[in-house]
């Protein structure tokens, strides 16, 4: 049994804030820092997995963090370029099926976090094999193959490699972005139902 400690990124819905300490403790983890409204950096021993039945329904999404750059992207000169190069140096040569980026604050009303994530993914793809750029729909991933996930926000950049099944979802952070300008848009409640149905594809 390994005694090594790994840093994870947990997404725990804000509605469970009153139970936050208990949820993290039951997962066998210790909180390091809160990132935005729903994300939390935690540390846990490698022998413990954050997906057992007691907390799996409360930890909406999780990712082992292999690379982090704490900073304020909008105030960092050439953030996209520096971040993409750093990710390339850290993960070059790793076997992955896709590169996906998302915002640390998926509920933000302004577009900056999503635009930042989209631009960062585009630049990162230029440093990796061309076949990774062929994936345009997160749901076409193999749930059992590793993906490089990256989350970016006012707190910085946080990346890791895991399978969609290990993370608990196909999309970075666990949220499906639906454009409000889309004529076929669905309600927020409908989006939540869609996300729940997608989880069935992880098995």
Language-model features: where?
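SAM-dependent transferase fold signal centered on methyltransferase-like domains
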Residues: 1-203
